[in-house]
């Protein structure tokens, strides 16, 4: 990936998550919204065969908005800014689909998990209804 493209992605996705923190944490838990991000990087949209509305089928839409007020009750909320269709935070780092790469993956990549085989690895190949993401 060219340096200019990496810089553009970094700019679009900085910060990669938001923390809605309480003034004082009084609740014994942390809430997380890993699939409600709505920042779709330009390079991702350009590589997708789907329009933005179709890509949103994999979002847990607005869960971050529903729960952002938990901070008022003493619990923090961590919310990803990018969508699950771009990168799924509830996957192993190397739960990767070989179909999405031009070069062989390292031996330690988990290429045979049920999720990868189904198109839903760390980098998804499909959206929630089974439509292919990439051209």
Question: Which residues does each PLM region occupy?
Answer:
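N-terminal catalytic or cofactor-binding beta/alpha core of small enzyme domains
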Residues: 2-135
């Amino acid at each position: 990936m060219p340096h200019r493209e990496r810089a553009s992605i970094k700019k679009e996705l900085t910060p990669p998550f938001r923390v809605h923190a309480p003034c004082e944490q009084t609740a014994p838990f942390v809430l997380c919204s890993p699939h409600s991000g709505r920042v779709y990087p330009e390079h991702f949209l350009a590589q997708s065969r789907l329009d933005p509305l179709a890509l949103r089928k994999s979002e847990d839409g607005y869960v971050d908005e529903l729960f952002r007020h938990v901070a008022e009750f003493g619990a923090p909320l961590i919310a990803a800014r990018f969508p699950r269709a771009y990168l799924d935070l509830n996957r192993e780092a190397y739960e990767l689909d070989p179909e999405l790469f031009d070069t062989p993956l390292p031996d330690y990549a988990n290429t045979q998990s049920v999720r990868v085989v189904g198109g839903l690895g760390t980098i998804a190949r499909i959206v929630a209804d089974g439509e292919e993401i990439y051209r």
